[in-house]
Design a protein with these regions (language model features):
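His/Asp/Glu-enriched, well-ordered alpha-helical/loop segment
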Residues: 143-156, 175-186, 191-277
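C-terminal cap of metal-dependent C-N hydrolases
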Residues: 256, 266-314
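Conserved, mostly hydrophobic/aromatic
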Residues: 2, 42, 97, 127, ...
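Active-site gating loops and adjacent loop-to-helix segments of metal-dependent hydrolytic enzymes
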Residues: 1-9, 48-75, 117-134, 141-155, ...
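Active-site glycine- and acidic-residue-rich loops that bind
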Residues: 16-23, 86-88, 105-109, 159-171, ...
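Active-site-adjacent beta->alpha loops and helix N-cap segments on the catalytic face
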Residues: 19-21, 83-98, 113-117, 137-145
Length: 314
C-alpha cells in the first residue's frame, strides 16, 4: 500500500504503548515487499492535548518503569518517542530514553518558549509536526513554534499539505529554519488512500474530504490521508520551492537524523536503491525498494487495505 504512495521506508507510529509489542513482532517478521520498517515511533503516551480546540485529555501516570517496559516491548525497534516535556516527571523519562539511544521529540505540548527551550536543553532534538498542537507565535512569547524554529539544534517536522499549516506559515518555517533541519512528514492515519466519505475510526465518526483531510464530526482536523508526495507537490507548485530542496527535506534529512544515511536518503553507489518515479503531476508511477520493483501503477493501480475500508465505511 505505502509503496503506491512513494514510500520506501517508515517508522510505524503507535499512540497507545500497548501496541508496541505487536508492531515489533510485525517488524521482526516483515520482509520488505513495499515500504521497509526501519523502527517504531511512539507518539505518546505522555501528551498534553490542550491545543486541540481547548480539549485537555490529561495523560497516564508517567514513570521510568513504564518507559523501560516500552523499550522492552519494542524489542529494540523503538527509535523515536514524542512527549510533552512540561508534564511533571517528563525529564526523568526523557533521560532514560536518551540513555537507550532513542531520539526524543516534543509533541502535543502546551508549554511556552522558556519551557520549550528547557525541554530541548534536556536532550529533546525534534519538534513533532511543527505548528500543530503546540503554542503559537505571539509577539510577547513565541511559544513552542518559536522555540523549535530558533533552536539550531532542533530538527522540525513539517506537514506540508497546506491545511495543517497554511502555505504562508510554511514559508515562514523555511525562511527562518535551515533547510537541513526540516523534515517533511505526512501525518497520515490508517485511512491513508481511502476515498472521500464518512467512516467510523479512532472511536469516532470521521469524514475524508476531497482534499484528503480527515475531520471529526465537529470539524476538528484529525490528520491526513495524503502522503508526503502531496506535500512536495504543494511546495513546488504553490510556493516554488525547488524540487531538490523538497527531496532533501523529505528523504535525506530524516535519513541523517535517525542514522540511516549510509543506506538511505539519496541515490548513490552502495546505497539501497530506493527509487520513486513520478509523472509531471506527481503521481507515483514506479517504486523500487533496494533495487526491486515493488509498485507499478499500470499493473497494480492504487493499493490500500480494502477490507479495512469496507469495515469502517458508514
Amino acid at each position: 500500500g505505502l509503496a503506491s504512495q512513494g514510500v520506501t521506508s517508515i517508522f510505524p507510529t503507535v499512540v497507545e504503548s500497548d501496541a508496541l509489542s505487536n508492531i515489533a513482532e510485525v517488524a521482526e517478521e516483515h520482509e520488505a515487499i513495499g515500504a521497509e520498517i526501519l523502527g517504531i515511533h511512539s507518539e505518546g503516551p505522555w501528551l498534553n492535548r490542550v491545543g486541540e480546540k481547548g480539549i485537555r485529555t490529561g495523560w497516564p501516570e508517567i514513570s521510568v518503569e513504564k518507559a523501560k517496559k516500552m523499550v522492552s516491548d519494542s524489542k529494540g525497534w523503538l527509535k523515536l518517542v514524542a512527549i510533552a516535556p512540561e508534564i511533571p516527571g517528563a525529564y526523568e523519562v526523557i533521560e532514560y530514553f536518551l540513555s537507550q539511544g532513542i531520539t526524543v521529540a516534543a509533541a502535543h505540548s502546551d508549554n511556552h518558549y522558556k519551557e520549550a527551550m528547557e525541554g530541548y536543553a534536556k536532550g529533546i532534538s525534534v519538534a513533532t509536526h511543527l505548528g500543530n498542537v503546540m503554542t503559537d507565535i505571539h509577539h510577547r512569547d513565541v511559544g513552542g513554534i518559536g522555540a523549535g524554529l530558533l533552536n539550531d539544534a532542533v530538527t522540525c517536522e513539517m506537514i506540508c499539505d497546506g491545511m495543517h499549516n497554511c502555505n504562508e506559515m510554511l514559508q515562514i518555517y523555511m525562511k527562518v529554519k535551515d533547510h537541513d533541519k526540516l523534515m517533511m512528514i505526512s501525518d497520515c492515519t490508517p485511512l491513508s488512500g481511502a476515498p472521500v466519505g464518512n467512516y467510523t475510526a479512532f472511536g469516532m465518526d470521521v469524514h475524508i474530504t476531497k482534499e484528503g483531510f480527515v475531520l471529526t464530526d465537529t470539524g476538528r482536523l484529525l490528520g491526513s490521508s495524503q502522503p508526503v508526495i502531496y506535500g512536495i507537490k504543494n511546495l513546488v507548485n504553490n510556493l516554488h520551492v525547488p524540487l531538490e530542496e523538497c527531496l532533501k527535506m523529505a528523504c535525506l534529512n530524516p535519513s541523517k537524523k535517525y542514522g540511516f544515511a549510509d543506506t538511505k536518503g539519496t541515490i548513490e553507489t552502495g546505497k539501497d536503491g530506493d527509487i520513486v518515479v513520478i509523472d509531471d503531476d506527481y503521481n507515483i508511477l514506479y517504486t523500487y525498494s533496494k533495487g526491486t520493483l515493488v509498485y507499478d501503477k499500470e499493473a497494480d493501480g492504487t493499493i490500500f487495505n480494502q477490507p479495512y475500508i469496507d469495515a469502517i465505511r458508514k
